[in-house]
Amino acid sequence: HDPVTATRAFVVTADVGEPMDIELRGLEDLDPAIAQAFTDAAARWESVIVRGLPDYVPSSPRPSCLPEDVDPLPAVVDDVIVDVATPVIDGPGEVLGQAGPTCVLSTTELGIHGIIEIDLADAAQMLANGSLGEVIEHELGHVLGIGTLWDTSWMQQGQRRLLQGSGTSNPTYRGAAGVAEWSAFGRSGN
């Protein structure tokens, strides 16, 4: 008898848990091209951050950290809510955008709400030269904690101290996991 062989192809995937969800509010008030740039930037971050955070149930829809001029929080926050707007910040040039977390959980030291403002006076030029998406990705990084939550000593129970030399001409990021990933990509420096 001839031997019998069989081949079967299959794909194995790892369960990374719940995905990262970035909810953008205020898109309907923006120029459609600008709104799309925000949507694309959020999708990019959601593809980079592969695991979401536990859902958060706020004790109040309007915690004291939430700015008065934004909508209340929903009954459940999954994972971060970002209110977006395009006010005139300083006119053409200079400040293109500004952003950061407004509500930070003491348990994770991560934001559940933040704000991004892109200077309306610069938005058309950034759309024309193709830089708007990168600027929004940069600002969204601040809402997610990059550069803004590296040191949480200002919080009552804040434990994170990832930035050495803050406020100097040579600040150094020293988070072990971040430095390891940076090195894994073949990068060097701080």
Range-by-range predicted roles:
Residues 1-2, 190:
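Accessible peptide chain termini
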